[in-house]
């Protein structure tokens, strides 16, 4: 089964109107691979601004959302609000949400369940720390994180999983294409054993750990890598080369 390549750009807490206009201009004028789905994860307050400037075929994602539709949750944003201003995706479970904001596997899974029920597509992030990798616990950690999602997600068609080795985020360290493929292959097998062979064959698994124009082409050749979740490089013109890594 062929899985459509999917590249997400996670701008994190970066950007202002001027820089977003510049990025939008770069993406609008570039020849982007029509066989690659592109999703931009923009700071929530700029989502509507970005939607008006970005090419309409690009998806737009919130970087977080809460597990209920509305209520007394100061500072939080709901999937319904994201949809209302033009987002069609949300990134959930990013390692920074887990590490800095203390989000648990269970909370992230509840967020994913609610976002899907509200009609958003979800980029569901997983990944291990350097300490966990060096202790040989990579598979154990990503299986635990997937297990939490699986308890809440019954229909996977609007889900993309992003494997981000935390030790390779913003550190300049990158998992080699072989290291990345090894974990992606494990995840594919886990899906086959624990969800279904159909989901294993169709679910897209992105790689997200210091992806650059320099390493994207090699990573994109791997059979179980179906795209990227790109951090810092998605704010730069080289993001176009990453989107076109399969060409």
From Swiss-Prot:
Its EC number is 5.3.1.1. It comes from the Eukaryota. CDD domains: TIM. GO terms for molecular function: triose-phosphate isomerase activity. It catalyses: D-glyceraldehyde 3-phosphate = dihydroxyacetone phosphate. Changing residue 142 to M: In strain: Ds-NA. It holds the Pfam family TIM. Keywords: Gluconeogenesis, Glycolysis, Isomerase. Substrate binds at residues 10, 12. PROSITE patterns: TIM_1, TIM_2. It is an enzyme of class 5 (isomerase). Pathway: Carbohydrate biosynthesis; gluconeogenesis; Carbohydrate degradation; glycolysis; D-glyceraldehyde 3-phosphate from glycerone phosphate: step 1/1. One of its GO terms (cellular component) is cytosol. InterPro entries: Aldolase_TIM, TIM_sf, TrioseP_Isoase_bac/euk, Triosephosphate_isomerase, Triosephosphate_isomerase_AS. One of its GO terms (biological process) is glyceraldehyde-3-phosphate biosynthetic process. The active site is at 94 (electrophile), 164 (proton acceptor). Homodimer. Belongs to the triosephosphate isomerase family. This is Triosephosphate isomerase. It comes from Drosophila simulans (Fruit fly).
């Amino acid at each position: 089964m062929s899985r459509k390549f999917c590249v997400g750009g996670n701008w994190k807490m970066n950007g202002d109107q001027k820089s977003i206009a510049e990025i939008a201009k770069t993406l609008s004028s570039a020849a982007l691979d029509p066989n690659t789905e592109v999703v931009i994860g923009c700071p929530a307050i700029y989502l509507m601004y970005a939607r008006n400037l970005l090419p309409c075929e690009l998806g737009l994602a919130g970087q977080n959302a809460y597990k209920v539709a509305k209520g007394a949750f100061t500072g939080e944003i709901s999937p319904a609000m994201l949809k209302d201003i033009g987002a069609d995706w949300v990134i959930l479970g990013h390692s920074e949400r887990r590490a800095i904001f203390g989000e648990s596997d269970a909370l992230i899974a509840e967020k994913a369940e609610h976002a899907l029920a509200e009609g958003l597509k979800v980029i569901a992030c997983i990944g291990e720390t350097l300490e966990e990798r060096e202790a040989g616990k990579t598979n154990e950690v990503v299986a635990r994180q997937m297990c939490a999602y699986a308890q809440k997600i019954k229909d996977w068609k609007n889900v993309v999983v992003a494997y981000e080795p935390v030790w390779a985020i913003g550190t300049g360290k990158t998992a080699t294409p072989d290291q990345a493929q090894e974990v992606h292959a494990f995840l594919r097998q886990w899906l086959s054993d624990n969800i279904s062979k159909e989901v294993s064959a169709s679910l897209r698994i992105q790689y997200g750990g210091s992806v650059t124009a320099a390493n994207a082409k090699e990573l994109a050749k791997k059979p179980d890598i179906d795209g990227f979740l790109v951090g810092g490089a998605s704010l730069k013109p080289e993001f176009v080369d990453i989107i076109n890594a399969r060409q």
